[in-house]
Structure formats: structure tokens, C-alpha cells
Amino acid sequence: MPKPWVVFGLGTLVLFLWRLNKIGRRPKNYPPGPPTLPLIGNLHLMPKKNAHLQFQRWAEEYGPVYSLMLGTKVAIVLSSDVAVKDLLDKRSSIYSGRPELYMGQEIMSGGNRPLFMGINSVWRRVRKLAHGLLNVKVSRTYVPYQDLESRDMLMGLLESPKDFLNHIRRYTTSLTTQMAFGYRTPSSDDKGLLEMFENFDELSRLTGSQSAAILDLYPIARILPDFLLPARRLGREYYEREKKLFMKHFLNARQQLNSGTSKPCCAIDLLRAQKEYGFSDEFGCYLSGSLLQAGSETTAIILTGFFQAMLVFPEVSKEAQEEIDRVCGDRLPDLNDYPNLPYIRACLKESLRWMPATALGVPHAVIQDDSYLGYHIPKDAGLILNVWAIHNDSKRHPDPRRYNPARWAGDNQNSAQAAVNPDPTKRDHFVFGAGRRLCQGMHIADRSLFLAISRTLWAFDLKRPVDKETGHEIIPDVDNIKDGLFISPMPFAADIVPRSESRAAAVRQEWENVAGLLDDDMQWKTVPEGLKWKDYEPLDDENEDLLESLS
């Protein structure tokens, strides 16, 4: 007769093997998905590049709600506007968590990056602070920054048009540094600006890497030393470098506040709130710096996509310029023209749809068991917002890879209004997320995009370059996309020329009109009240309340 310890050992081994055999397999009541392998599930199918295209193909094969088994974890992929509304919006109280993002949050952010925070008391405090910093009323303080930086971008395009990609990123990054810390990045070769570029590129690359995925999905791998995990070592170095940068600017803002020379920015508002909320300088500096960081890069990518689309679909720029000339004539467009430029607003919407930057979003997590469409969704499952698939659904948007602003004719919603529309089919895009994770600064991004698009087309023609050897026009490859947490067009060439000598002279004059407000270091002397254009957009208290209820 076998000894009891032998029976116990065999039983334990059988149980272990049985449970091991279950890892990676899809339970019958889960949403459908690709075939799995034991232990790894669908990990062997995860694409090394162009993940957004594979996720779109799976949506076409398995439907608007499908699952991916990722080792010991599961991801539910939402690929329809209705599913996003039903779960992330209507059930936001349980669908607003974040899966554990070990590399992105713990290693590269010290736990302080709002974008990656899970639901806890710190995140709730951050959301309350962020609403106070970025709500519709407060964000009007930043309109002078948007006006000045868009004029500076025009000057850059006039003086060095071949460097247009850097002028775009300087525009959006300088807006971010002003709104975050109150200082400008006046040159596309500014050391601080280049450091911001490099930091965000590295954040996107490392958090979207296979090494990060392994550490997220298999926590046991975290016990390995850094020399076996070079990505984690780079992540630690990144965090120390970024924290040092943010702290320098945060302490400088404190010095300006104490001396009475501060400019409107998030850091100043946080410093004023620091005593009430009791947070540390490290937390404050990181919140100031990272709160708007993702929005800056998103805006730059959308604008880059717009420039590319104008080369591929030149008929759009012609129609847009006809509208601008009809409404503005020889006057530089401003935010007061927003209601009278419906085709430009349509270009804004189409740019957000066509090159969405966050093609797969930042994943949510459900905090308790739930069911949807007869499927079981387990607690802690990740929820992926399949933005690319929704934006390129031919039933929702016929001929989706064609840049066609006419598809938005009659749609007068801004991004915030569309996001809270009870009819999900009326939502224009999903770039800014959903539910309680909806970006609170989307109205700032809409304004930045409107000014950049309308003013660029007023001043310049965007033309295809010509190959000197063949004489043929060079058309950018719209499928040549840089991968990572954020996707963007790979660098491409363009010929950007003033529409006339008078428009070129007007660009110079418009810059001179505001350059006198800057000191010798090209920083603001004072922020002028007269540039706020308080009449261009009535405050929409109803939609503000709806956004607040979601967030």
C-alpha cells in the first residue's frame, strides 16, 4: 500500500499538471479568438510590427469583441463603437482600471505617470487635480501660447521648410512646456526640446517592446538581474533622467512663483495646491511634466499625418484653401473663425481618424467579473480599445484609407461633445480614449490642431517633391508607419512653399506682431490678455458636466 506522503505528492503533481495545462487555453465562455497553445496561449501570434493591422484582421475574423490569451492573462479587444460605449463608458465604474504595466509605470515612471496609474486613491486625487488644471474655463489661459506657437511654426516653415517635421514637434512640445512649466522651447534645435523628443521616443519604444510585454505577463521574470534584462536597465536610466528634467523645471516654477514672475501653467497651479493636498515635490514635478506629455506627441503625430495626407490627396488642400480665402481673405485665421470654417473642422476630424496615433490605445482593466453579449469577462482582464479597427471599419467609414473630410459634412461636434454623445455611432474618433480615462485636455488639442491646419493652408501650398533623376512626383507611402505605444508616419519629404509673396510677408509681419512680447531669450515678458478670444467658443457647461461625470 502506497505511503500517504506518496499519495499526497502524486495528487499534488496531478493537480499542478492539470492547472498548468489550463494556462493559455481559452475557456469556453470567453469571447472567441485565435487558436491557442498550452502555456503561452496566443503569445506566439503577437506581431512584432504593425500590431494594429493584425488586431484589425482579427476583428474582421472574430467580431467586435474577441479575446487574446496571453500566458496567464487575458485581453479583451473591443473593436466597435457600441462595445466601447457599453463597457468603457456605461460601465466605467468597473472598466477604468489599468493592467499592471511594470515597465511603463513602475520602472520608467516611478509609479507617478497618470496615464498608466491603476484605480486607487492617488489616481482619484490626480484626476481631481487634472480637472482643475485642464478644464474648459482654465485652459483658455493657454490660448495665447497656442496663438504664438502657431505663428512661430509658420515662420519655421517659411525659413526652413525641409525641416517641417521638427517644426511640427517644436510647436506641440513648446505648447506642452509652457502649459506644464511656463517656459518656451523657441528653436527646433533647442537642447531641452531635443531631450523631450528623445525621451518620448524612448518611452514609446520601451513600453511597446517585447521585453516589456514579457515582464508584464510573466512577473516571475522580474527576479532576473538587470544584466539579463537590458530593457529594464534602460528603463531605470530613463526614469532618473526624466525625473531630473521635470524636477529642474518644477523648482524653477517655484522660484518664479515666489518672485512674482510666474506665467500661467500647471506647475504653478500645483504649487499653489501642494499645501492643501500634501504631495511631494517629486510627485508634483512628475504630474506637471507627464500630464500633457502624451497629448503633445499625439497632436504632433496627427499634424504629421495631416501634412502627409495633403501630399497624397492634394484635392483636399485646394478645397480647404478656397474656404479659408473666402472667409479670411488676406487675414491670418484665428479661433474666432472656427464656426465659419466647417471644411477645416472636417479636416481636423478626418486627421484624427486617419492617423490616430494611439492605434490600440492604452489598455483598461476590469476590476470585477462581468458579462457582455453572453461572454464572461473575468476580473483583471485587460481591455484593448482597438482604435485603428474602429476608425478603418468600412461599414462605419466607407473607403477608410481615403482622407475624405466630406464624410464629416454637417457634424458640428468638437471632440468633447462627440465623446459624450449617447449615440456611439455619432462619435467621430477615439484618439482621446473613453470612459473615466478620457483625456481631459482634448479641447486644448482641438484648438492646437485647428490653428495649425487653418494657418498652414492659409500661408502655404504643400506639394509633392519631384525626383531629380526620374522627374516623377514622390508620393509618401501611407503604410510606412513607425511602431510603438504610439504609431506615426515614418519621415517623408515635402515641398512647402508660400502661396504668394504677400502671404510670406504676412507671415513675417504676424510673427513680428507678437515677437515684441518676448524677451531676449524668446520667453514671455507678460502673457497678453487680448489674445484669449473669449468670444470664439461659448462655454458649454452641459458637456463640461458630462465629461466630469465620466472622469
Swiss-Prot record:
Record keyword Heme present: yes
Glycosylation sites per record: 392
Chain's gene name: virE
Keyword Heme among record annotations: yes
Enzyme Commission number(s): 1.-.-.-
Phylogenetic lineage: Eukaryota, Fungi, Dikarya, Ascomycota, Pezizomycotina
One Pfam assignment: p450
Descriptive protein name: Cytochrome P450 monooxygenase virE
Segments traversing the membrane: none
Pathway of action: Secondary metabolite biosynthesis
Residues making up the signal peptide according to the UniProt record: 1-25
